[in-house]
């Protein structure tokens, strides 16, 4: 890379927003012969660094440094970047500040899945993944369930109540009593409600408080376990499950209360992946309906 050709990606808000900005920026930077640097803004209370979650060998820039660069003529490209400025290639430094994935030089959406799949999780995340995997999921078919009930978008709360998940889980269990569920939930109350109605499920319990390092590491572990499922019941209007789908290289079907997909547990007999840290390497069964 040429040392003075850089792209700084300013990441903020939730994990899904941050990762799609940083990883699409990484893909764009590579395509344009630029070095990637990134801002991991902790002003919203996000305690962990990106390097607490994945090994990420790129330079982190402070929000203050990024804002000073803005004041000295390196302004942010913001929001949905549909078209790069005509002179962008001549700029030694580009700063992007958005919650959306970038588009490439031709204006097409960047597929940042390959960059996600090349990341290596930290030992703390790996330990969480294998604790759940070895205890309840290894060698079994399972369906992922991801519930957003804490500080969720109003569209998510309205369209994806806990009762909808419970109803679908009961139907899937009736189809195949041997199917296990892996539950990813951001609410202890929702987790209890599911277990009371459906019975025991695979779920992380020692997850810590919202936005703490422990909690976000647990969320990353959830992503890999959801990615290794035969299919996922997910919330409407959420950026979390799409990360798991990219980890699986789009091999999992995601059903929510508003889309046309419908999972089936009929005929699921074995695991979908052999290594939960590599959910893109699929084995056989998938839970999509005909």
Describe the residue ranges of each PLM region.
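Nucleotide-activated donor-dependent transferases that construct or modify glycoconjugates
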Residues: 1-12
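Gly/Pro- and small hydrophobic-enriched strand-loop and loop-to-helix capping segments
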Residues: 30-42, 235, 247-278
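Histidine-anchored nucleotide/phosphate-binding helix
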Residues: 19-30, 165-173
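Active-site regions of enzymes building and remodeling cell-envelope glycoconjugates
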Residues: 53-56, 196-206, 250-252, 268-278
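Secretory-pathway luminal glycosyltransferase catalytic domains
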Residues: 1, 45-171, 175, 283-290
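A short, glycine/small-residue-rich beta-strand->loop->alpha-helix junction that serves as a flexible
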Residues: 11-20, 154, 158
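Short His-Asn-centered micro-motif
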Residues: 9-11, 39-40, 146-147, 183-186, ...
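Donor-binding and catalytic core of enzymes assembling or modifying cell-surface/extracellular glycoconjugates
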Residues: 176-262
